[in-house]
Amino acid sequence: MRDTTWVNGEPAEQLRADDRGLLYGDGLFETLAVRRGHVRHLALHLARLARGCERLHIAMPAQPLLAAELQALCAGRERALLRLTLTRGPAQARGYRPTGSELPTRVATVAAWPAPVSLPFRTRLSDVRLACQPLLAGLKHLNRLEQVLAQQGAAAAGVHEALMLDSHGGLVCGSMGNVYVRIRGQWLTPPIIDCGVAGITRQRLLEGAGGAGFPLREEQMGVAGLARAECIAISNVRLGLQVVHWHEGRELGVDPVLARVQEALDADGQ
């Protein structure tokens, strides 16, 4: 099936040129998986979107409306990838300052599920540092230039993913997902405090979705921690929980527990 886009609940492929999402990146987005016409973990994604709207003072559309639109858009799709973008809407005045009277624009696109990535999965440390801005930390906002630059560097280096540090040298995430590192048998993930996206899979794993065999905890680490990593994994909606086979040219171990964790994540479809 071809890609399908709805704008504000209607089939369309164009936005107004003065939409603040285009002008300033003034908005948020969610990427969701679709299985057998069902949008997976929709409640968790809409809850994160609502938190972002509250932080940015964007009027959040009614969640039942969004849920109904997304389920209708995805009806009949066996397996697909769905992106929901919410902008503050068309500008009501020139300049950065919103008037408060903007009407949000919602854009939903459903596309075929991407082909599997080639293996072995390789990562490198990005030359791009994430700027620290606690007001935006955790949000999946539309300003993604740091990730664009990091992915350009990854492509030039011939690797799949770039692991990103903040301006203080702390590990935060990958350019396209959260990161998990096993050190001395313990799986760790960096806290999302000053920057980075608080992913839905990461949230589920911290809440115990991986089962008793995958006790995950937050811990700050930097380059030295990565150097001691026995295993590394990346998560996002498309990849699931992806094992990293090589980091910076060093071959890593593969923890067999990750396959069981992925099975547990897949089984919990909500």
Residue ranges and their predicted role:
Residues M1-P64, A68-A72, G76, T87, ...:
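Helix-start/capping segments and mature chain N-termini
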